[in-house]
Structure formats: C-alpha cells, structure tokens
C-alpha cells in the first residue's frame, strides 16, 4: 500500500512540475502598417482607383494574392522566436476593408486570428483594424471614434481611433489603434490627433481604475516630436505620471539609431506602441518587459537605389513584390 502511495505521489509531482514548466509568463502585442492592402474591386465612394486592374499600379489578382501571402508571412512570424504563440493582438494600418482582412486570415498561418474593423471616413479607403488571437485575448467591447478635423481641415482628417477592450492573461487591457495624418499635413494636425487620443485615454482611465492601456499606431511622427509629447509619452519610466505613457521607442531611435522607415537616408520611428503607468510595475501583474523593431533581412531591400530601405510592394509604379515601407514593432509583456 505504501509503495502505491509513493508511486501516486511521484506521478502527481511530475504532473505539477510539467504544468509549472509550461505555464506562460511572457506575452506579446504588435503593430504593423501593411502599406496599401487593397483588393482589386472598387469600393463605392472611395478613391481606390490606383489599385484596380486598369489603375496606375495595374493591381490584379496575382499581385493581390502575393501581397496577402507576404503580409501573412510577416504577421505570423512576429515574436515567434520569443513567444511561441505569437502576438495576442496586432494593430494594423492601411487595410481597405473587411474583405481584405477576411482574405488575409484565410492564409493558413493566420487562421487562428480574428479581426475587428469598422469602415472609416478616409477618402482613399484605408482603415485601421485589430487582429487578435481569441485563445489569448478575450474581446469585451470595441468601437471606432471618429476624429474631429483640425480647424475645419477635412483633407488631412485622421482615420478614426479604434478602441478595443478585453482580457489578456486574466487582466483588463485596452488598446487604441491609430493612423495619424501623414507628413503632408503640418505638425499641428498630428498634435490635434494626439490631443484627441489623450482625451480618450483620460476618459478610459477615469472609468476603469488602474487600466492597463496600450496606444499603438503609425503616428507619422517620431517619439520626441510635439505630438507624442502632447499624448504624454515619456522617454524614461521614472518620468511617467498618472495618465501618461512610457515610450520605449524614444531610446530605440535616439540612442540606438534603429527605426521603422527610412526617408532620404534617415531612419524614422513612426510605428509606436506606448504603455500606461499600470503596465510599468516591477513585480505584480501584467507588465512591460522589452520592445523590438522586427527587422529581418527579407524585409530589407538588398541592392539598388534603395538598398537598406524596407522592401516595399512598389518602387514608384514598378511592382517589387515586397512587404511594406514600414517595419513592425513588438512589445513583450511579462506576467
């Protein structure tokens, strides 16, 4: 009888040990500007004519399928060398509609993801969306908040702010996905967008005490620019006050010289993910661990005039069968 008891206890200890070994303590979230993920069909009321078969890019089914495959290759690789499950959610920009997202998630490597998307007001028809793994991130609510124009400027109106709230690792987490106006608009237009996001963040943090809030997107500004300071995104953790954010990308760009897009030989880091103060705790709960610009050789042009730049879908009007003019960014969270 004693022998059976000890055998049972030994087996039980093995099961417990195995469970402890497989317990997750690291999660990831990411952002990626997909650069013009258009299908080949005209959307009524949208200026998508360049991306039609008879448009300036001669956009056809072959090119569209190649684009989907390329995007899936990148998205399904994000953080996998660190977190086996991949990102719990991925904010994306420059997607035309729900149709392209449906097609993207039909790619075998992306089939475990779902998406949240609302049709926005952008005249070209490009929107933000959130891809999420329901096994990791349980969505509770979502909405798109439309942007108010800056001094009546509807030409440079931003795409709206996608807000999704849910549970990650058993904790309430909220994410705001952004795509702020391009550099074709002057700085005050992006400062205006930042002011609106800060107001949304303040409202959310007032409603949910100690909310773990993530703001991500293509801000079309660098971490040290005025718009990001208006948002309250700080370089050092010790500087972050209640209601503000930690911005790890400031150090990435300024101190390490690493960015997400190259313009005239200079790196910018427009694709940022910033974290509210409750995600900075040192010991308890879900908290910031480290960040990464996802830089792989296949994402970079290896020769020619634009050697060293992210390998785009097009160079001018020439189809390069590349990926995007931006590189993805990843945040790792420890539990």
Question: How should each PLM-predicted stretch be described?
Answer:
Residues 89, 95-172, 180:
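Structured beta-strand-rich core segments of catalytic domains in phosphoester-bond hydrolases
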Residues 35, 96, 181, 219-222, ...:
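Catalytic metal-binding/acid-base residues of hydrolase active sites
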Residues 20-21, 202-213, 221-335:
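Metal-dependent phosphoester-hydrolase catalytic domains
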Residues 1-24:
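Bacterial Sec-dependent N-terminal signal peptides
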